[in-house]
Amino acid sequence: MKNIVLIGFMGTGKTSVGKLVAKKLGFDFVDVDEVIEKATGMEISEIFSKFGESRFRDIEEEMIKLITPKKRQVIATGGGVVLRDENMKRLKKDGVIFCLRASENVIFERLKQTTNRPLLQVENPEERIKELLQKRMPLYEKADFCIDTEGLTPEEVAEKIIKEYERLSNGKT
């Protein structure tokens, strides 16, 4: 069985939806950011502040190399995983990629209370969301399937993913 890989901007529901999908299918749930934190002994925000985004992306790429060969996993990636083509090639080789989407406004509303998002620790987080989304959207669109999460519960999004995955699998994954 191929892995189910969730990509998308922060605040689109990758972790909450991923846990539901994994539970319903009996797959393991893997949050790439959690794997990074466990491997480094540091929070993501600490890695960003001490070493910068580039070093974080190097670590992320290494963790993806370790994670992807295993089967029957739901993998929730960080929002910037798409910035490195090598990550997407690996994830696609061993998985079906689902992009979770939401509008800038919805993302801002979902994230405005959080303090653990290093890329949003700026003077104007709304503008930063818009800027990052514009840069990443063409990369997110390379997913096998895109699901708009606005107005849907995590359970409804999970059901859409499972339905599409099972249709696609049909004994092949």
Curated annotation (Swiss-Prot):
The residues that hold Mg(2+) are T15
Q: What is its EC number?
A: 2.7.1.71
What's the record's note on cofactor binding?
Binds 1 Mg(2+) ion per subunit.
Q: Where does substrate bind?
A: D33, R57, G79, R136
- The top EC class is transferase
Catalytically driven reaction(s): shikimate + ATP = 3-phosphoshikimate + ADP + H(+)
Q: Single GO cellular component annotation? A: cytosol
Q: State the protein's name.
A: Shikimate kinase
GO process terms (BP): amino acid biosynthetic process; aromatic amino acid family biosynthetic process; chorismate biosynthetic process
Q: Could you give the subunit structure recorded for this chain?
A: Monomer.
Which species is this record about? Thermodesulfovibrio yellowstonii (strain ATCC 51303 / DSM 11347 / YP87)
Q: What does this protein do?
A: Catalyzes the specific phosphorylation of the 3-hydroxyl group of shikimic acid using ATP as a cosubstrate.
Query: Which UniProt keyword terms apply here?
Result: Amino-acid biosynthesis, Aromatic amino acid biosynthesis, ATP-binding, Cytoplasm, Kinase, Magnesium, Metal-binding, Nucleotide-binding, Transferase
Family assignment from sequence similarity = Belongs to the shikimate kinase family.
Cofactors needed by this protein, per the record, are: Mg(2+)
Q: Which domain of life is it from?
A: Bacteria
- Residues bound to ATP are G11, T12, G13, K14, T15, S16, R117
Q: What does the record give under GO molecular function?
A: ATP binding; magnesium ion binding; shikimate kinase activity
Q: HAMAP family annotated for this entry?
A: Shikimate_kinase
Where can this protein be found?
Cytoplasm
Pathway membership = Metabolic intermediate biosynthesis; chorismate biosynthesis; chorismate from D-erythrose 4-phosphate and phosphoenolpyruvate: step 5/7
